[in-house]
C-alpha cells in the first residue's frame, strides 16, 4: 500500500480543485492554495484575504480542508471542497453569501451552490450549510476516479480535555479577561487588582 503523506493528499485535493473548477465554474476560478489543517467544528473554510504570497506581485486565497475529516469518502471531501469553492466564487463576484461573521449561509449562498453543482440543505442557526453531492458531482467523481483516492489511512477520534482557559472578572466594572494560566491582573479601566 502506498504511504499517505500530506503532500500526496494536498496534490489529490489540487487535482479535485482543477476538475471541479473546469466542470462547475468553466475554469474561471483563480488558483487557490489548498491547505490541510484541523478546523474545529468545520470540514473546511475559505479565507477571503489573499494571505499566500507567491512572489512580489502575486498573492492567493486559501481553501482549507480540515485534516481531521480526511477519513471520509472522497466524494464527501469533494463536496466540502466544492462548498468552499462556492464561497470563493461568491467572494470574487461580490456576492454577500454569509452573515454573522461567516457562520450563517444565506439564500444567496444557496443559489450559488445550486448553480455550481452542489446540494445544500437548511440547518437552524447556520443556514444553507448542510452540503451533499449532486448527481453531477457524483458523475464527475466517477469519471475522474475519485472513489479510488484515499486521503487518510487512519484518523483517530479524540476527546479534548478540560479547557485550561480561565475567565477573570473585574469586581467593580465587570470587565472580563481570559488567560490560559493563573495570572495577577490589574483592571486597566478602574485600576483594581
Describe the residue ranges of each PLM region:
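Metalloprotease/metallohydrolase-associated module, dominated by Zn2+-dependent proteases
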Residues: 2-72, 95-193
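An amphipathic alpha-helix signature
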Residues: 78-79, 110
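Active-site recognition of the HExxH zinc-binding catalytic motif
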Residues: 79-92
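Conserved glycine-rich acetyl-CoA-binding loop
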Residues: 75
Amino acid at each position: 500500500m502506498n504511504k499517505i503523506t500530506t503532500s500526496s493528499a494536498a496534490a489529490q485535493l489540487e487535482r479535485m480543485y482543477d476538475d471541479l473548477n473546469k466542470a462547475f465554474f468553466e475554469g474561471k476560478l483563480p488558483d487557490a492554495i489548498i491547505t490541510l489543517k484541523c478546523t474545529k467544528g468545520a470540514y473546511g473554510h475559505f479565507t477571503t484575504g489573499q494571505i499566500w504570497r507567491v512572489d512580489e506581485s502575486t498573492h492567493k486565497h486559501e481553501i482549507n480542508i480540515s485534516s481531521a475529516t480526511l477519513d471520509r469518502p472522497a466524494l464527501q471531501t469533494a463536496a466540502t471542497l466544492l462548498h468552499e469553492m462556492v464561497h470563493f466564487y461568491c467572494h470574487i463576484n461580490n456576492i454577500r453569501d454569509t452573515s454573522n461573521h461567516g457562520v450563517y449561509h444565506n439564500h444567496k449562498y444557496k443559489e450559488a451552490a445550486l448553480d455550481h453543482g452542489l446540494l445544500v440543505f437548511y440547518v437552524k442557526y447556520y443556514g444553507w450549510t448542510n452540503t451533499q453531492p449532486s448527481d453531477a458531482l457524483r458523475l464527475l467523481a466517477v469519471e475522474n476516479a475519485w472513489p479510488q483516492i484515499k486521503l487518510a489511512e487512519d484518523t483517530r477520534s479524540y476527546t479534548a480535555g478540560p479547557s485550561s482557559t480561565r475567565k477573570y472578572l473585574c469586581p467593580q466594572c465587570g470587565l472580563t479577561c481570559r488567560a490560559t494560566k493563573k495570572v495577577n491582573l490589574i483592571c486597566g479601566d478602574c485600576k483594581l487588582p
